[in-house]
Amino acid sequence: MRQEDIGQDGDQRLLAGLTGKIQTVTGLIDPEMLGVCLTHEHLLIDLSDLLPPPNTATARAFYARPVSAEAAAYCRNYSEFGTAHHALDSVETAVEELGLFKQYGGQAMVDLTLASIYRDPVGLQRISRAAGVHVVMGCGFYVAATHPPALSDWNEQQIAAMIVADIVEGAAAEEESRSTGKGVVYRKNTGVRAGVIGEIGCSSPLHDDERKGCVRPRGPNGKPVLVFSS
């Protein structure tokens, strides 16, 4: 997306075709097709970067164990338990669970996993098709601790360009970004388009980069913004 296309007039032109529609990972649908919808879920996610191992020997040994009934009480009290507790990475499990959701009347789900916590656009598309449930994908930037280092140097227009590109052109393949480091942005387009902005991270106090990360794109494109506050 060209920088000159980002701005109120450019955004309106590029996004005009989305007016009155819901954009899912498999395409546009009419709002009445959304039905019963969960608005903040994570079908595929990896929070490992936010939850480093503990710093004592006994805690590290416990941390390395798989999630089990024996460790259930610890898991409930300490969300940082174990590497296996940090990620949802099974398409098959997600399809199975969405099948149960559909069985009880669910029709749609909004997945708010972002690139810095390893969004998987193609995985979400596979899940949606296999389960027969509409999935709306988020875009934007999570809490500042997960931002690519270069984001501090980007202006609002550059950030807006990336967000609007996810909505209009399609999201990048995040495995490409992950393997080359978060400081490098690659636009290997998957063709899977975002339908909402978020979840935008809001630390306490709010970081300057978090503030500029969603304010500008919201105005011209009319997409809802979902936030996470800590």
Where are these regions (language model features)?
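Divalent metal-coordination and catalytic microenvironments
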Residues: 40, 109, 141
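Divalent metal-binding segments
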Residues: 68-95, 113-116, 199-206
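Long, hydrophobic, well-ordered secondary-structure blocks that form the structural core
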Residues: 126-145
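Histidine/acidic residue-rich metal-binding segments in metalloenzymes
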Residues: 23-24, 29-32, 95-103, 107, ...
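Active-site environment of divalent metal-dependent phosphoester hydrolases
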Residues: 44-46, 115-119, 144-145, 203-205
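Short, ordered loop/turn segments at secondary-structure junctions
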Residues: 114, 140, 230
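Active-site gating loops and adjacent loop-to-helix segments of metal-dependent hydrolytic enzymes
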Residues: 45-88, 139-160, 189-193
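N-terminal basic, low-complexity leaders that serve as flexible interaction/assembly modules and, when applicable
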Residues: 2, 7-77
